A protein has these predicted regions:
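Generic N-terminal amphipathic, Lys/Arg-enriched alpha-helix
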Residues: 1-28, 306, 349
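Conserved N-terminal alpha-helix of the aminotransferase class I/II PLP-enzyme fold
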Residues: 17-62, 69, 86, 91
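PLP-dependent aminotransferase-like
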Residues: 61, 71-136
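Active-site phosphate-binding strand-loop segment of PLP-dependent enzymes
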Residues: 113-178, 191
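Conserved active-site segment immediately N-terminal to the catalytic lysine
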Residues: 185-197, 207
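Active-site C-terminal subdomain of aminotransferase-like
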Residues: 197-288, 292, 356
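Conserved C-terminal alpha-helix-loop-beta "cap" of PLP-dependent enzymes
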Residues: 291-363
């Protein structure tokens, strides 16, 4: 007997499980099995991953799942380029028994003055620190949303080479990467973390954790310190779905994952390389616009992310987003870097994520330009 509602699972079973109602897709259904298979296949294709895992929650749930799987009571090294890579430190500090000590390589201001730009700790210096400290895991942000800093493939390769020399795993946070897809095989990344709501134009509902073959082997010798964020358990569930099998650990966000699968298919049809090119073009034009209006970039030359633009301001109404809201735009307030910045550090942040923005570069730039005109006129 088919499901009651035609938009949920028209070819499925009549819902009487103890998990869902008729208004949500059942995780045991054939339709949802196909959804998960499609998502995992796309993730492995785009990131050149050996294994893909879905962890319900958000990108931060994925970060914590990785930390609690691979870094229990182990020394770690953290590349900190702002508040959202400081999050790794917060995860370890929240459970004093989790970490075995951390070494932090912080971003640095390039030049003097409150609005001098920031660059990550030099790659060779980080690599030397890895070789000297011999951490078990190295964590780095591909794009840091507090500073707008992006790490180049060459920078990442320098760090992964050093990490592998000392037997460490290299973990790259790509939640805020947008369409700047990272090739795990080409860069040597062992664990890559993403999420649906930025680069994938989906609804927030989970973390996507990709593993290299090396990390897939390493996880077998580890035990998570979390029940709900048990990465190995979620990996086993993902591998089961790939075989057409379902299992239960905690309730999965089935309907949001359906939407994610749909937008992934839309992006593939349009072209992953094409949206990457659009992301780069949009970022360059928005950065040029802001700098022409007197808002310097917080990220130094060579490290300017195309998907997250963080700019300096001295205006509290721009910093907290109020003036943008008054003209119809939702921006993000500036946040601290936790990189020894001064008390006068003040920024605002603009996100350039999603198919609607990428496919309509000039329209997106026009929205921002008009808003800046209106803010200036009201000053």
């Amino acid at each position: 007997m088919p499901g009651l509602l035609p938009d949920i699972d028209p070819d499925g079973l009549l819902e009487f499980s103890v998990v869902y109602t008729d208004r949500a897709l059942n995780h045991m259904s054939k339709r949802f099995t196909g959804v998960v298979q499609d998502i995992l296949g796309t993730l492995k294709e785009v990131y050149h991953a050996h294994t893909a895992v879905l962890v319900p929650g958000s990108g931060t749930f994925g970060m914590e799942a990785v930390a609690r799987q691979f870094a229990n009571r182990e020394k770690v090294l953290i590349v900190r380029n702002g508040w959202f890579s400081y999050r790794w430190t917060q995860i370890f500090d929240a459970d004093k028994g989790l970490g075995g000590g951390s070494v932090v390589c912080k971003a640095r201001q390039q030049g003097s003055g409150p609005q001098a730009p920031w660059a990550p700790c030099p790659a060779e210096e980080v690599a030397a620190t890895i070789r000297a400290e011999k951490p078990k895991v190295v964590f780095a942000p591909h794009v840091e949303t507090a500073s707008g800093i992006i790490l180049s493939d060459d920078y990442i390769r320098t760090l992964t080479a050093a990490a592998h020399e000392v037997g460490a795993l290299f973990v790259l946070d790509c939640v805020a990467s947008g369409a700047m897809w990272v090739d795990m095989q080409a860069t040597g990344v062992d664990v890559l973390i993403s999420a649906p709501q930025k680069g994938w134009s989906g609804s927030p509902c989970c973390a996507m954790v990709m593993l290299s073959e090396r990390a897939r082997q390493a996880i077998e010798g580890t035990t998570s310190s979390s029940f709900s964020c048990d990465l190995k358990k979620w990996m086993q569930i993902a591998e089961g779905y790939e075989k057409g099998q379902h299992a239960y650990h905690t309730t999965m966000p089935t309907d949001a994952l359906v939407r994610l699968r749909e937008v992934m298919a839309e992006t593939r049809e349009y072209g992953f390389a094409k949206v990457r090119d659009e992301q780069i073009e949009l970022g360059a034009k928005v950065r040029a616009l802001l700098e022409s209006r007197g808002f310097p970039s917080a990220a130094a030359y060579g490290f300017k992310a195309p998907g997250v633009v963080v700019s300096y301001t001295t205006d509290p109404g721009i910093q907290n987003g109020k003036k943008f809201m008054e003209v119809g735009l939702q921006t993000a307030a500036g946040v601290p870097l936790q990189c020894d910045e001064g008390p006068d550090f003040k920024t605002f942040r603009i996100g350039l994520f999603g198919l609607e923005k990428w496919h309509n570069v000039d329209r997106t730039v026009g929205h921002l330009s008009k808003a800046l005109d209106q803010i200036a006129a009201a000053a």
